[in-house]
């Protein structure tokens, strides 16, 4: 998986450089928006280095997802390299897509969904409600504005997970909770996605999603 991450990061920088070469950005200054997700942080910082080597002045703008799309639609940010489509960020694209241009695909085999340790004996989201006591009736998530959180709200409704609370936190807090639970051999369910190093460090699996709430494979786009 690591080699695909590297290819994606390099490709994002190349796409951005090609776009800038055909644009009329004033004074060659580019504003790159990014959220606090590892792949987005890596792609944005590498793109900054590549663009600066080609004479561009680059400003990195860190924000939550909703403000990023507002900023993109208002032309206060020029580029976002971490748009997960067609499902995860669909609501944002439906709202702001008319004012956003696609630069290209960065990574074509991304996936999002609910993730558990391999030792957890259930295989499907449809089994969660019957096992809510094992999971302390919690799905551990990330920041509230993230696309995966919006989709998980839809999954809770679609699968009748009325006994669960979707816990808002951050990526780092979620991963700390995952490690703590796995060290104790406890059951835990989190909002997860690939590419992400958690699948290299921990023995994890996606729960099957027979209703396809999370869709199939996602694509990461530069916009």
Residue ranges of model-derived segments:
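Short helix-initiation/N-cap motifs at beta->coil->alpha
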Residues: 37-38, 59-71, 166-177
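Periplasmic-binding protein-like
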Residues: 106-113, 198-223
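A conserved helix-loop-strand patch within extracytoplasmic ligand-binding domains
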Residues: 98-145
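Pocket-flanking alpha-helical
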Residues: 44, 64-97, 176-177, 197-203
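Ligand-binding pocket segment of bilobal, Venus flytrap-like solute-binding proteins
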Residues: 77-81, 151-212
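Ligand-binding cleft/hinge of the Venus flytrap
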Residues: 47-55, 130-166
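Short, well-ordered beta-strand elements
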Residues: 26-39, 56-61, 136-140
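C-terminal motif of bacterial Sec signal peptides marking the signal peptidase cleavage site
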Residues: 15-19
């Amino acid at each position: 998986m690591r080699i695909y991450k590297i290819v994606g990061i390099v490709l994002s920088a190349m796409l951005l450089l090609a776009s800038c070469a055909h644009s009329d950005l004033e004074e060659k200054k580019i504003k790159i928006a990014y959220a606090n997700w590892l792949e987005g942080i890596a792609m944005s910082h590498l793109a900054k280095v590549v663009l600066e080597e080609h004479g561009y002045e680059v400003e990195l703008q860190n924000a939550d997802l909703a403000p990023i799309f507002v900023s993109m639609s208002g032309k206060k940010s020029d580029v976002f390299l971490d748009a997960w489509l067609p499902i995860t960020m669909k609501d944002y694209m439906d709202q702001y897509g008319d004012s956003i241009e696609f630069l290209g695909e960065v990574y074509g085999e991304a996936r999002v969904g609910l993730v558990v340790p391999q030792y957890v004996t259930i295989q499907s989201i449809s089994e969660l409600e019957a096992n809510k006591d094992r999971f302390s009736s919690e799905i551990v998530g990330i920041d509230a504005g993230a696309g995966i959180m919006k989709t998980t709200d839809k999954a809770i409704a679609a699968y009748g997970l009325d006994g669960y609370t979707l816990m808002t936190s951050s990526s780092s807090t979620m991963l700390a909770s995952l490690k703590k639970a796995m060290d104790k051999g406890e059951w835990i369910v989190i909002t997860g996605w690939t590419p992400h190093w958690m699948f290299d460090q921990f023995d994890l699996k996606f729960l099957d999603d027979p209703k396809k709430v999370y869709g199939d494979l996602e694509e990461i786009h530069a916009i």
